[in-house]
Amino acid sequence: MYASSARDGIPGKWCNARRKQLPLLISKDFPAELYHSLPCKSLENGHIKKVKGVKATLAEAPATPTEKSNSEVPQKKLKVLVAGGGIGGLVFALAGKKRGFDVLVFERDISAIRGEGQYRGPIQIQSNALAALEAIDMDVAEEIMNAGCITGQRINGLVDGISGNWYCKFDTFTPAVERGLPVTRVISRMTLQQILARLQGEDVIMNESHVVNFADDGETVTVNPELCQQYTGDLLVGADGIRSKVRTNLFGPSELTYSGYTCYTGIADFVPADIDTAGYRVFLGHKQYFVSSDVGGGKMQWYAFHNEPAGGVDAPNGKKERLLKIFGGWCDNVIDLSVATDEDAILRRDIYDRPPTFSWGKGRVTLLGDSVHAMQPNLGQGGCMAIEDSYQLALELEKAWSRSAESGSPMDVISSLRSYESARKLRVGVIHGLARMAAIMASAYKAYLGVGLGPLSFITKFRIPHPGRVGGRFFIDLGMPLMLSWVLGGNGEKLEGRIQHCRLSEKANDQLRNWFEDDDALERATDAEWLLLPAGNSNAALETLVLSRDENMPCTIGSVSHANIPGKSVVIPLSQVSDMHARISYNGGAFLGTAFRSDHGTWFIDNEGRRYRVSPNFPMRFHSSDVIVFGSDKAAFRIKAMKFAPKTAAKEDRQAVGAA
């Protein structure tokens, strides 16, 4: 039970908790203005013992109802067989066990759960799925959320891939807070599966048991796993993924639908400069896009999508090289993250989905997750839909059992499965369509006139905004809040028994609303080191300059030292650089460059490739990724904001090109 002092101090409904150390939960009516940012938390991955296959037995119902703890849920006379030990199968197994059913999961290979084999990277669990996990088991939901990294209380959204400028920001925080839902997190897929598998118990998951066939005689279902004996249960749940054997046996073989995109994915030890303010971004380009997300622990996960025929193969150790070729010329956020990723950490796969279907099952067999509604990853809702499926299926089985117990008649398993399917089809179908639509939008995105016009592509160099980009933003700004509100909160009313609440540990920075509306305020909030990095092949003699964020320490740049001027003096001994050429100062969270009168001038190249001369004695704001040129192209520097300055640049004796 929560402490009475905390409970009495905050209005709203409260629910009991089974662990005293759980984060404080507060009512959804608590003022949203009081949510402020906290750093992401993560837990060490645990270990799981190898699961041995055992024969399941039909549990007997208790003779008399007794009060039991959560670990002693009275079992019911219902044996549920589950094909597939992925996230959907394991979440459903947990939900079924919590409701007292005898569940047995057949999994072909649990090496991923044990942390072996290729690392598949993190998974985003959004507010709707986290709420479903809470409705299944609050303790389990807390453990999963504590192991994840919160991204929903930061800025997320669409970005132009070339310039890095924000195109549309997504507010996933407000829909969650207004509905009393957990805030979106990213968690290691392996960690999530380990938590779910550990809580099942060793007698629940059958390893090396791939379900390839089954028989439904109307009263029971018998499965025939490879290399295993037959098992019989009251129903079968196919949670065996996009290439589901259960689905094939139900409805016959069917072709997957290729999305038109191949996907490179990787994870890197990399911390962006704006890690405290930005969670995930989708960088848009014509027929290609790049997704990056903070996953906690100083790591970033990314996905790079490129429109091309299926079945492509890279040369040995050639994935990174091709990735940089495809996205060459894109903004620093994309290039830096790609460069920071090791070759052996990059995977490639073609993206497929399945068209929506009205047939989810037959008789005593039903499907769940990717086996019936595999969708493209553009909304991050594939795993979330499987979690929602799991909750709904367990709920419908529980209702059918209760009706059976009250009436004294046999449980109507078949009707309960059809009820589950009916409850899920519309919502899943809409989200499936939205995921496809997101891919179409990415394919059609054109930042400038001339993009994709072949012989007329030279028009691109004039950087004229494409009309579709302007019009598209209007419709996205109008429709995105409504879409996010429904996707994240549209299933909340079906979560029976879950009390709406929010956590103080999920509070956002009090400037979050301002950041959504003001790109400049968002950039000024970046807590990072600012550097001038030599740009171009002719700058081998130049060294990195570290700029000071002390407003009383401006940086004076010239061909000779100016030790008598307050601040730092940087010497660039080139003939095109005047004695006192320019000054860089810091004011109000922004860097300003002031050019003095000189024969060769000072030039800026902004993040969209536009080059212009800086007017003398007129301070000009510059941004990360801009290029500043002192006198000529031989003294060009790229401006870069970094969370941590390079060690070589941090040394004081290397902060200037010449003696100061």
Curated annotation (Swiss-Prot):
User: Which co-factor is required?
Assistant: FAD
UniProt cross-references to InterPro entries, sorted A to Z: FAD-bd (IPR002938), FAD/NAD-bd_sf (IPR036188), FHA_dom (IPR000253), SMAD_FHA_dom_sf (IPR008984), Zeaxanthin_epoxidase (IPR017079)
CDD domains linked to this entry? FHA_ZEP-like (cd22702)
The record's annotation in Pfam families points to: FAD_binding_3, FHA
| GO biological-process terms attached to the record | abscisic acid biosynthetic process
PANTHER family xrefs? PTHR46496, ZEAXANTHIN EPOXIDASE, CHLOROPLASTIC (PTHR46496:SF1)
Transit peptide, from-to: 1-49
Q: What induces it?
A: Up-regulated by oxidative stress and when chloroplasts undergo differentiation into chromoplasts.
Q: Where is the FHA domain?
A: 545-609
Q: Where in the cell is it found?
A: Plastid, Chloroplast membrane; Plastid, Chloroplast thylakoid membrane
Q: Which organism is it from?
A: Capsicum annuum (Capsicum pepper)
**Catalyzed reactions per annotation:** all-trans-zeaxanthin + 4 reduced [2Fe-2S]-[ferredoxin] + 2 O2 + 4 H(+) = all-trans-violaxanthin + 4 oxidized [2Fe-2S]-[ferredoxin] + 2 H2O; all-trans-zeaxanthin + 2 reduced [2Fe-2S]-[ferredoxin] + O2 + 2 H(+) = all-trans-antheraxanthin + 2 oxidized [2Fe-2S]-[ferredoxin] + H2O; all-trans-antheraxanthin + 2 reduced [2Fe-2S]-[ferredoxin] + O2 + 2 H(+) = all-trans-violaxanthin + 2 oxidized [2Fe-2S]-[ferredoxin] + H2O; beta-cryptoxanthin + 2 reduced [2Fe-2S]-[ferredoxin] + O2 + 2 H(+) = (5R,6S)-5,6-epoxi-beta-cryptoxanthin + 2 oxidized [2Fe-2S]-[ferredoxin] + H2O
Per its record, how is this protein called by name? Zeaxanthin epoxidase, chloroplastic
**GO CC annotation: what is one?**
chloroplast thylakoid membrane
Q: What does this protein do?
A: Converts zeaxanthin into antheraxanthin and subsequently violaxanthin. Also acts on beta-cryptoxanthin. Involved in the epoxidation of zeaxanthin.
Binding residues for FAD = 79-107, 357-370
